[in-house]
Amino acid sequence: MYPYVKYADGTEVVFSHIMKNENDEEIIHVHFERPTDNGFDSVRFELPSCKILYKDGHYTNEEIDLFKSVVERGLPSFYRWARQGGIKIA
């Protein structure tokens, strides 16, 4: 997983390398995770469909909608960065 961003509430966002699904299509997983007193709040999306693969914890519907917006708007960039082996910062 490659790091993307860390939000003020402690949510960290990471994304995977490019993988192939059962139909031989290129996919990427984008994972949002926030530490809690009892573990983690987690949501994982699959690109390019932006469908939720996994959800656990106490993220609100508003937070999940925001995360979905992030992955939808960032879709081309996530693929570019995954091909590069992560985000390159000079």
Model region roles, listed by residue range:
Residues K55-A90:
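Acidic, low-complexity intrinsically disordered segments
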Residues F15-Y59:
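A short, structured beta-strand/loop element
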Residues T11-V14, N38, E62, S77:
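A general, composition-driven signal for non-globular sequence regions
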